Amino acid sequence: MSYQQQQCKQPCQPPPVCPTPKCPEPCPPPKCPEPCPSPKCPQPCPPQQCQQKYPPVTPSPPCQPKCPPKSK
């Protein structure tokens, strides 16, 4: 084996070291869904017409003279 042949034989090189795989970005935190819109209050019931608690007051009949007028 000549000196030149020995020179040519490169010692085995270790395979190139693969760079450590870069950690993938962590998943972004899930975005909170918009909170449910607060249910819109239905329009309040229109106020009920006041129920007359008492029957409407009938005007009292005009005063009648108790005594019939004296016939002259």
Swiss-Prot record:
Listed under GO cellular component are: cornified envelope; cytoplasm; cytosol
What role does it play? Cross-linked envelope protein of keratinocytes. It is a keratinocyte protein that first appears in the cell cytosol, but ultimately becomes cross-linked to membrane proteins by transglutaminase. All that results in the formation of an insoluble envelope beneath the plasma membrane.
- Keyword tags: Cytoplasm, Keratinization, Repeat
Q: Where are the transmembrane segments?
A: none
- Record Pfam families: SPRR2
Q: Does the keyword Cytoplasm apply?
A: yes
Q: Which organism is it from?
A: Homo sapiens
- Pro residues bias: start-end ranges: 33-47, 56-72
Family of the protein in this entry: Belongs to the cornifin (SPRR) family.
- Biased composition of type Low complexity is found at 1-11
Task: Provide the residue span(s) of the region labelled Disordered.
Answer: 1-20, 33-72
Supply the induction statement. During squamous differentiation of epidermal keratinocytes.
Top-level taxon of the source organism: Eukaryota
- Give me the sequence repeat coordinates as residue ranges: 21-29, 30-38, 39-47
Localisation per UniProt entry: Cytoplasm
Repeat among keywords: yes
- Entry protein name: Small proline-rich protein 2D
Give the InterPro entries listed for this entry.
SPRR2
Q: Where is this region: 3 X 9 AA tandem repeats of P-K-C-P-[EQ]-P-C-P-[PS]?
A: 21-47
